[in-house]
Structure formats: structure tokens, C-alpha cells
UniProtKB/Swiss-Prot annotation:
Name the UniProt record assigns to this protein: Snaclec alboaggregin-A subunit beta
Membrane-traversing stretches: none
SS bonds (residue pairs): C4-C15, C32-C121, C98-C113
SUPFAM superfamilies (alphabetical): C-type lectin-like
GO CC terms in record: extracellular region
Oligomeric and partner information: Heterotetramer of the subunits alpha, alpha', beta and beta'; disulfide-linked.
Family membership noted in the UniProt record: Belongs to the snaclec family.
Keyword Translocase in record: no
Record bears the keyword Disulfide bond: yes
UniProt GO MF annotations: toxin activity
Stretches assigned to the C-type lectin domain: 1-125
Length: 125
């Protein structure tokens, strides 16, 4: 099987890493791409994946928010993950600008894209 690089955590063929450094959404997406050539801000496709990511974010960040790779800053109405995956799993909590996920229960909230939150990066192994 594929081993994630040092410092990354593996779940069902994907690698994840939480960074304890706040930045805006655009910088966070660029930051993830710099960490690994296939990496983007995290996208969620199942509740199991959500539980895994919460288990990684909460111990580091406690009660806070992480950026997800979901925004509508480029295309009105079209919602897709920044890594190009289609939106097939949803947990909305309102209107979207850029989306954050709570570190405690993965409730999704919209936030101004210029606010600073923590990146969680993900890529397919």
C-alpha cells in the first residue's frame, strides 16, 4: 500500500495534514499546493472521513475552524471542491462564501474568504 509522507496521516488511500497556522482561504489553498504537488484544502466525501479529520484537528486546534476546499468565489451557484472533485456529501449550515468546518463536530459554516483560519491539506495517495 501507499505510505503517506512523514507527518501526514493516512485514511482510505488519502493523506491529510493539519497546520497550526492561520491564513485566508486563497493563501491556504496555495499553501496546501506547496506542501505536495497533488495536495489541496480538504474535501469531505463521507461521515467516516469527517470523523477521521475531526480526530486529527481537535487535539491540535481545540475549538476552532478549518478551511475546506469549498468556495463559490469563482463560479456563482457551482459548488465543487478545490481539488476538482464533485460535491457528493453535504453538511451545510447556511449561505456560502468560503466554507469552514468546526473542529469539534464538522458543522459547515460560511465565512468571508479573507478571514484567517487553519488549513487541512489532503491528497490522493
Amino acid at each position: 500500500g501507499f505510505d503517506c509522507p512523514f507527518g501526514w496521516s493516512s485514511y482510505e488511500g488519502y493523506c491529510y495534514k493539519v497546520y497550526n497556522k492561520k491564513m485566508n482561504w486563497e493563501d491556504a489553498e496555495s499553501f496546501c499546493r506547496e506542501q505536495h504537488k497533488r495536495s489541496h484544502l480538504v474535501s469531505f466525501h463521507s461521515s467516516g472521513e469527517v470523523d477521521f479529520v475531526v480526530s486529527k484537528t481537535f487535539p491540535i486546534l481545540r475549538y476552532d475552524f478549518v478551511w475546506m476546499g469549498l468556495s463559490d468565489i469563482w463560479k456563482e451557484c457551482t459548488k465543487e471542491w478545490s481539488d476538482g472533485a464533485r460535491l457528493d456529501y453535504k453538511a451545510w449550515s447556511g449561505k456560502s462564501y468560503c466554507l469552514v468546518s468546526k473542529t469539534t463536530n464538522n458543522e459547515w459554516l460560511s465565512m468571508d474568504c479573507s478571514r484567517t483560519r487553519y488549513p487541512v491539506c489532503k491528497f490522493x495517495g
